[in-house]
Amino acid sequence: MKKTFSAFLALLIIVSTAVTASERADVDPKILSAFQKEFSFATNAKWEVKGNLTQVNFLLNDQGVIAWYNSDAELVTTARNILYNQLPISVIRTLEKEYAGADFSGITEVNRNNETYYQIRADEKSKKYLLKASPSGNIIVLKKIK
């Protein structure tokens, strides 16, 4: 029984290593190096090449993050889900004023080109919006969902 379990465990380790290696097989080594420098404490990295961009989903301090790199191994964008109470106070004040009574969900903090903004889904009684908010509280409607 112990030999069977040991053999199974060894096979599992080999398969896991092969899967990890194959997940990185298509990723440019420059991008892997840039990622390891930028996010040295990241865990559970999952890679996907999408056209000219390479996307990596990973955990950083137990929080899910997505990052995109261009073909020059430059970090283009990062995104992570956050809670309503993690929004800047100026954004919360504007949301409470302009969308009083709405439910907010799907809140994502995005960093792109040295700019931070927040994408927020606002559900009112009969309307749904995808909003974009700047840290200063300026909000625009990106899309009316219903």
Summary of predicted features, one role per range:
Residues 1-25, 35:
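Bacterial Sec-dependent N-terminal signal peptides
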Residues 22-146:
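Interaction-mediating elements
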